[in-house]
């Protein structure tokens, strides 16, 4: 592995909310403001670390749909709403589904460069209040992001159709996609039953109810039921509601410091950031980013895929995982070992920090050393973060 340039950056703490279904009537958080979700993980990550919140020099939050309740810099709003120090600034970033992972990566880079000593990388998304249709309605009123000039160069389509293109290019059968979905639910249910998520989850109270586990897991999911689902994006397609990620609500936060700062505060460094990357890829298929992101991380660190003990690849759509598996041939017993977004859910701007949080805790639980997170992102992007437990 390469030695990172600049100062060593360590993860001190990482937490997340239970992930709720993004359902207007049945979702955990149907009556919850996204500020409350993000604010909760801010308060908890500081409390668990046992530090004065004033030690945090900046907070970065990922969020995709930044308008309405999630507008006007939700990172700052959630921090202030919790009564945390006004001297700590905040900013909100959008790298589509990789937004929270990018928030963590940006924080790590700033610490490595010596700009700050302690930061929080985080993310939030309330898809129950902000379905994809909400963004389209806003564009209908205020103008469309994809101009004719852009579309002339890249005929951008929805992510579901991009997933179908990937399934076609890599000749992935529908049965393989459904098998990945069943695997995700089975592993997520097993992890929940065994209490694997308990340390990372912050219990969340709403209207007298306390939620401590993820809402979207369906332990009875089976191949027969999935095979009966209709294609979601084209009549003869392979991608369905069952082999794609769920519409979800949630938040996650990761507290990072320089190794020197953590030592000065008497804190245990739980992992260090070895490397990070972001890549661009075809903006039409758009979801193959984890393939080159993984290639780049491996090459730059002189590693093989088998050198990584645990991998979290976001299950935005099953074809993303299937194509990545074909290209990199990983041991799947090391991949998404506690399930993924098809079972747990995918609150867009939050998932990257959630994946890093889950990876950290699983490295500790299973006594493993090297972990990697990679995600596909809208617009043709891929993200990667390589960590080492210490």
Located regions from the model:
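Conserved beta-ketoacyl condensing-enzyme motif
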Residues: 28-143, 201-213, 284, 305-327
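Active-site-proximal alpha-helical scaffold in enzymes
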Residues: 93-125, 167-197, 253-260, 326, ...
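Conserved catalytic cysteine-centered active-site region
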Residues: 32, 63-117, 153-159, 220-246, ...
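N-terminal extracellular/periplasmic Venus flytrap/periplasmic-binding protein-like
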Residues: 15-18, 30-40, 48, 176-264, ...
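Active-site pocket-lining segment
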Residues: 164, 200-202, 274-343
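Condensing-enzyme catalytic core mediating Claisen C-C bond formation in acyl metabolism
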Residues: 2-32, 224-288, 292, 299, ...
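Short, well-ordered amphipathic alpha-helical segments that serve as non-catalytic structural scaffolds
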Residues: 34-50, 74-78, 103-106, 160-166, ...
């Amino acid at each position: 592995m390469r030695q990172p340039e600049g100062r060593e950056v360590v993860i001190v703490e990482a937490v997340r909310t239970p992930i709720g279904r993004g359902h207007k009537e049945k979702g955990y958080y149907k009556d919850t403001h996204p500020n409350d979700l993000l604010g909760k993980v801010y308060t908890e990550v500081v409390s668990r670390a046992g530090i004065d919140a004033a030690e945090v020099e900046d907070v970065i939050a990922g969020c995709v749909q930044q308008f309405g309740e999630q507008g006007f810099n939700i990172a700052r709003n959630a921090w202030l709403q919790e009564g945390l120090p006004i001297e700590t600034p905040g900013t909100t970033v959008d790298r589509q589904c990789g937004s929270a992972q990018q928030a963590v990566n940006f924080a790590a880079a700033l610490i490595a460069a010596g700009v700050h000593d302690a930061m929080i990388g985080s993310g939030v998304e309330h898809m129950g209040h902000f379905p994809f249709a909400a963004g389209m309605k806003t564009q209908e009123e205020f103008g469309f992001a994809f101009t004719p000039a852009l579309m002339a160069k890249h005929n951008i389509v929805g992510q579901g159709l991009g997933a179908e293109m990937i399934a076609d290019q890599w000749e992935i059968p529908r049965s393989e996609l459904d098998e990945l979905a069943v695997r995700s639910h089975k592993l997520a249910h097993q992890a929940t039953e065994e209490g694997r998520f308990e340390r990372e989850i912050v219990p969340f109270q709403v209207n007298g109810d306390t939620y401590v586990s993820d809402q979207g897991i369906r332990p009875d999911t089976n191949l027969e039921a999935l095979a009966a689902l209709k294609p979601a994006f084209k009549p003869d397609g392979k991608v369905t509601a069952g082999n794609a990620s769920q519409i979800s609500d949630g938040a996650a936060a990761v507290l990072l410091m320089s190794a020197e700062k953590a030592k000065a505060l008497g804190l245990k460094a739980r992992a260090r950031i070895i490397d990070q990357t972001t890549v661009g890829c075809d903006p039409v298929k758009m979801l193959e980013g984890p393939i080159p992101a993984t290639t780049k991380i491996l090459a730059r660190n002189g590693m093989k895929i088998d050198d990584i003990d645990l991998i979290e690849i976001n299950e935005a759509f099953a074809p993303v995982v299937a194509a990545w598996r074909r290209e990199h041939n990983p041991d799947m017993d090391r991949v998404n070992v506690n399930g993924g977004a098809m079972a747990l859910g995918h609150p867009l701007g939050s998932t990257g920090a959630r994946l890093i949080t889950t990876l950290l805790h699983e490295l500790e639980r299973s006594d493993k050393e090297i972990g990697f997170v990679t995600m596909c992102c809208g617009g043709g992007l891929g993200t990667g973060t390589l960590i080492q437990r210490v």
